[in-house]
């Protein structure tokens, strides 16, 4: 390894450390400013709460374990909907790729379904499926699945056609083109899709919990807003932010 190469790697590591430091610094300054404004009365601490009050609220709720129950419910529903979206979208995208005529027929319907405001579907899901976990999981799926199918099908369709023709030249079948070229070539798109879907599924689950849950962080947000326990509300939002970051980091780790 040359000196120039070592110097370049050192520069990259230094830049990464600086990025991490600046991210932490921005978060720290924001929390510090928030705490100072709440303590000095610049903002109403009852309405806007403060970092110290949120931490105190979290610690109190850990004593009886209720906060972990709500977190566990939301995580379970999010992961189930995410796994179902990932598997279903891959299978349907494969089906559309295998039958091009079917994709031409269904394309406008997929676009329309993807454009629908999913929050408007949640009350209908409650009528159809009842106020239960299934409804919340389906609500989580509905936010992500149609866009995921469209993205994956587009990725499958834009694979290098020369490689596919080479498979056919060697007397391969369509299934060989799928397993040897299309799917391996689409792995980056699938991983990228998973990064987007994990956040969308979390959003969909929270929407479902707003309307059809008796536990979970979405339920806790609605309940705390109704009884003006804004410390609970902001604590739930902060926990959701942490969950979203951790889930994204896990997918990012899988990609590497």
Show the residue positions of the predicted features.
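Short helix-to-coil transition segments within interhelical loops
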Residues: 116, 156-162, 166-186, 226
